[in-house]
């Protein structure tokens, strides 16, 4: 079998965004004409503060929010100390009588102050408790640290406040109503006036995103390449994902900004990590550092655990009492947020996408309620509700019933039981259509593994999607367990990957002039990191391990071009967007629809629009998703994908330039063909409304267009995967401790694998084509549920694969040109200069 090494390679600079003659530009300004914002040294921190102040709606809101955070921490510590040392619970529970009268026979009411101990007694009990004193001292030191940091941040944000007022000319009262694109456009203009960055004459939108999201882009790439230990197989639970805020904080502490991290400062990777000569020594140093941080986490585990429990109790106890079903609701997991995030996507942009996908995701997960669990919940709710109704009726008749011991507690518990049981009872009017719901979810979240399509009705797909969209109760439980589990993950799981992490940062870091060291994936260069099966065939030179998985490069490029219509992409990216535009035009014309790309109207479309959307862009998505199930006779399985793609292409063609004074619409009678705009503008579409629509409306249409592009690109990828089923996916080798590739012995005979090999982020095998009776059964499921067919069920000749040393798949007899260059030995690259990527 064919074997080849899968070592990371050094990337070469692929393009230069600098205008001619500005490659080595250093802008000099006379001393007397410098503004207060000329040559800001730490632009990463500066732009991050500008963005944070915008997201927090101004200086006043940010100031008050920070003050309340300090007060909240102080309240949790003080109130917990009071409950532990200053309350007489015997009086509170009526185990001890209190006599306020001279006549013992007279009845006396017990008040709350009666249960409070005197100040002297309370102080003495606190002083006698050594453990409590230790916790209070640590909490006090931490609070003083936060107070000093708060004062420092206020001084820094006051400078940002002045920058908004004088440089950007945006008053604080208007800031909550300005979009980030408006603020960003003014920053670009301010660069021309004040020379914020002296290394470039002009700033681009991508420069600002790189500054704000430098470390976040690295985290997205690490998750995309499956280098962080986030997946574990537990007995009885199977494969689980564990990624909490505490674990993420430790990852960032180790890699980015902590003492001894890989970065010299916010914008520069240390020089020794850019060369391969000391990779083993650096890996050992990183491994030791991870060990010490893991030990520190283990020592601080009791304090962090106590804080997590107290904070969770004070945060969710009232919510649980008021809305017992709140913990049964779902939320996007931290792993899901990182897996679904585009390169160069700000937090509010990600949150907006996930918010749009929340309702269809909830409906999809509700489709899988167990019939047995539903039956038990109905009967449990009946019995609990019957007892609760009797107690409520007795209380209405005579309120003295509440004075009986445990009656109020029983009423509360029965109410919680009824509410929880109702959350497991599905709506009797709900229609089971998981395929359509999954397509709606895909339109908003933009990413999903290949083997989900056509298998939306399977429990395996449901379980994997639950890793992205988890119960709120599971989220809280993971955060509570985080102080205990995090040290174990750091010491036993992250340390063996130290060498791979060192290689990753060396080979996937480029130095951009005027920006600093950035993750090469964040350049969104389809030539360096594109995937052949994601419209990059013939346009990419990336090897297997250089390719971003799940179409991350292509979808991120499309998202950034739509979100920032003024951005001028490099040549390769422009060619990719132009190719996609031409493909949209061809498929839209082949759809056989009306001249303007108008989707046919019928009663079902109108009802779906009225039920699923309140705005025209969302109704267009509803039309596209529901179209194939509601229009025309059923097609063969191999033709359904073509019809899906044609419908999405027709919808994309309906995004056309608006004439002055024309109302915004998703069904303009003209198409983008011959509109005269360049490939990027035509592909994004949203730029043609600039200056004619308000920013919020423009953002809504841009989001809708990106949703349609995501559906369209996934359909193209699916058809290319069917034509070329062998998908080359990067996988790390679990047993590789040195990072160097070692050939793995394979059998002599050819062995067939699943038509769509497992994904890096979701390494679960797709269903194999089964026996005839299995195929017939799947056909029955397809007739029942509708939607996209499973490409894995299409009969085809078996393909021959060989197992890569790091877990990927390679076709037998693959060309030797795909072999990467071996990593040099110790000291072989000591004299090589660091890689520079001029932009």
Curated annotation (Swiss-Prot):
GO CC entries: autophagosome; autophagosome membrane; endoplasmic reticulum membrane; Golgi apparatus; Golgi membrane; late endosome membrane; mitochondrial membrane; mitochondrion
Comp. bias (Basic and acidic residues): 724-736
Keywords of this entry: Acetylation, Autophagy, Cytoplasmic vesicle, Endoplasmic reticulum, Endosome, Glycoprotein, Golgi apparatus, Lipid transport, Membrane, Mitochondrion, Phosphoprotein, Transmembrane, Transmembrane helix, Transport, Ubl conjugation
Cytoplasmic compartment spans: 2-61, 155-290, 302-319, 329-371, 425-470, 481-483, 493-839
One protein family per Pfam: ATG9
Catalysis: reaction(s): a 1,2-diacyl-sn-glycero-3-phosphocholine(in) = a 1,2-diacyl-sn-glycero-3-phosphocholine(out); a 1,2-diacyl-sn-glycero-3-phospho-L-serine(in) = a 1,2-diacyl-sn-glycero-3-phospho-L-serine(out); a 1,2-diacyl-sn-glycero-3-phosphoethanolamine(in) = a 1,2-diacyl-sn-glycero-3-phosphoethanolamine(out)
BP GO annotations: autophagosome assembly; bone morphogenesis; mitophagy; piecemeal microautophagy of the nucleus; programmed necrotic cell death; protein localization to phagophore assembly site; reticulophagy
Keyword Zinc among UniProt keywords: no
Residues annotated as signal peptide: none
PANTHER family per the UniProt record, alphabetical: APG9 AUTOPHAGY 9 (PTHR13038), AUTOPHAGY-RELATED PROTEIN 9A (PTHR13038:SF13)
Family per similarity comment: Belongs to the ATG9 family.
Name the UniProt record assigns to this protein: Autophagy-related protein 9A
């Amino acid at each position: 079998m064919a074997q080849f090494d899968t070592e990371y390679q050094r990337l070469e600079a692929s393009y230069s965004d600098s205008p001619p003659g500005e490659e080595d530009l250093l802008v000099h300004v006379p001393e007397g004409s410098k503004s207060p914002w000329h040559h800001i040294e730490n632009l990463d921190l500066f732009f991050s503060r500008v963005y944070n102040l915008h997201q927090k709606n101004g200086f006043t809101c940010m100031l008050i929010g920070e003050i309340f955070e300090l007060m909240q921490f102080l309240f949790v510590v003080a109130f917990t100390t009071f409950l532990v040392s200053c309350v007489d619970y015997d009086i509170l529970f009526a185990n001890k009588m209190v006599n306020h009268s001279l006549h013992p026979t007279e009845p006396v009411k017990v008040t709350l102050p009666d249960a409070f101990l005197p100040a002297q007694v309370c102080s003495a009990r606190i002083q006698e408790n050594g453990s409590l004193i230790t916790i209070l001292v640590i909490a006090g030191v931490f609070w003083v640290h936060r107070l000093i940091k708060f004062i420092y941040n206020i001084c820094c944000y006051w400078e940002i406040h002045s920058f908004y007022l004088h440089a950007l000319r945006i008053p604080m009262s208007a800031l909550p109503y300005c979009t980030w694109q408006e603020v960003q456009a003014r920053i670009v203009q301010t660069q021309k006036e004040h020379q914020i960055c002296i290394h470039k004459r002009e700033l681009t939108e991508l420069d600002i995103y790189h500054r704000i999201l430098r470390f976040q882009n690295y985290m997205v790439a690490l998750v995309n390449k499956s280098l962080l230990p986030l997946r574990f197989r537990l007995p009885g639970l199977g494969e689980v994902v564990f990624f909490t805020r505490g674990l993420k904080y430790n990852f960032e502490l180790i890699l980015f900004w902590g003492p001894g991290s890989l970065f010299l400062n916010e914008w520069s990777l240390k020089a020794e990590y850019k060369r391969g000569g000391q990779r083993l020594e650096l890996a050992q140093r990183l491994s030791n550092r991870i060990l010490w941080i893991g030990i520190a986490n283990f020592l601080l585990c009791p304090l962090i655990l106590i804080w997590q429990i107290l904070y969770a109790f004070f945060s969710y106890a009232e919510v649980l009492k008021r809305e017992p079903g709140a913990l049964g609701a779902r939320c996007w997991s931290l792993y899901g947020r990182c897996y679904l995030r585009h390169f160069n996507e700000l937090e509010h942009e990600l949150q907006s996408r996930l918010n749009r996908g929340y309702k269809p995701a909830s409906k999809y997960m509700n489709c899988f309620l167990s019939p047995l669990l539903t039956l038990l919940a109905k009967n449990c709710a009946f019995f609990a509700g019957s007892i609760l109704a009797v107690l409520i009726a007795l209380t209405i008749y005579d309120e003295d019933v509440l004075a009986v011991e445990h009656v109020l507690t029983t009423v509360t518990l029965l109410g919680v039981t009824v509410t929880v049981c109702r959350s497991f009872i599905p709506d009797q009017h709900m229609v089971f259509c998981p395929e359509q719901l999954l397509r709606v979810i895909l339109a908003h979240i933009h990413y999903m593994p290949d083997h989900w399509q056509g298998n939306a009705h399977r429990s395996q797909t449901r379980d994997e999607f639950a890793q992205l969209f988890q119960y709120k109760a599971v989220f809280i439980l993971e955060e509570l367990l985080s102080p205990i589990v995090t040290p174990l993950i750091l010491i036993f799981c992250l340390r063996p990957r130290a060498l791979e992490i060192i290689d990753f940062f060396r080979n996937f870091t480029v130095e951009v002039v005027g920006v600093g060291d950035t993750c090469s994936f964040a350049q969104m260069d389809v030539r360096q990191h594109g995937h052949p099966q994601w419209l990059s065939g013939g346009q990419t030179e990336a090897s297997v391990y250089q390719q971003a998985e799940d179409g991350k490069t292509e979808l991120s490029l499309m998202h950034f071009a739509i979100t920032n219509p003024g951005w001028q992409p490099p040549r390769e990216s422009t060619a990719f967007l132009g190719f996609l535009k031409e493909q949209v035009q061809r498929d839209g014309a082949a759809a056989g629809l009306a001249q303007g790309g108008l989707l046919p109207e019928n009663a079902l479309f109108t009802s779906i629009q009225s039920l699923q959307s309140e705005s025209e862009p969302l109704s267009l998505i509803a039309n596209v998703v529901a179209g194939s199930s509601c229009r025309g006779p059923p097609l063969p399985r191999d033709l359904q994908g073509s019809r899906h793609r044609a419908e999405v292409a027709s919808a994309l063609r309906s995004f056309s330039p608006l004439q002055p004074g024309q109302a915004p619409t998703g069904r303009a009678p003209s198409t983008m063909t011959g509109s005269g705009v360049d490939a990027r503008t035509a592909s994004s579409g949203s730029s043609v409304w600039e200056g004619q629509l308000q920013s919020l409306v423009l953002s809504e249409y841009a989001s809708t267009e990106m949703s349609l592009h995501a559906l369209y690109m996934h359909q193209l990828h699916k058809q290319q995967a069917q034509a070329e089923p062998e998908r080359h996916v990067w996988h790390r080798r679990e047993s590789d401790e040195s990072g160097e590739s070692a050939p793995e012995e394979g059998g002599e005979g050819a062995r067939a694998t699943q038509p769509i090999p497992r994904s890096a982020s979701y390494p679960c095998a797709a269903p194999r084509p089964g026996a005839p009776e299995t195929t017939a059964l799947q056909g029955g499921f397809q007739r029942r549920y509708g939607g996209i067919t499973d490409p894995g069920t299409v009969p085809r000749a078996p393909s021959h694969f060989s197992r890569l040393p790091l877990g990927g798949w390679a076709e037998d007899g693959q060309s030797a040109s795909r072999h990467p260059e071996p990593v040099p030995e110790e000291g072989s690259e000591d004299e090589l200069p660091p890689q520079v990527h001029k932009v």
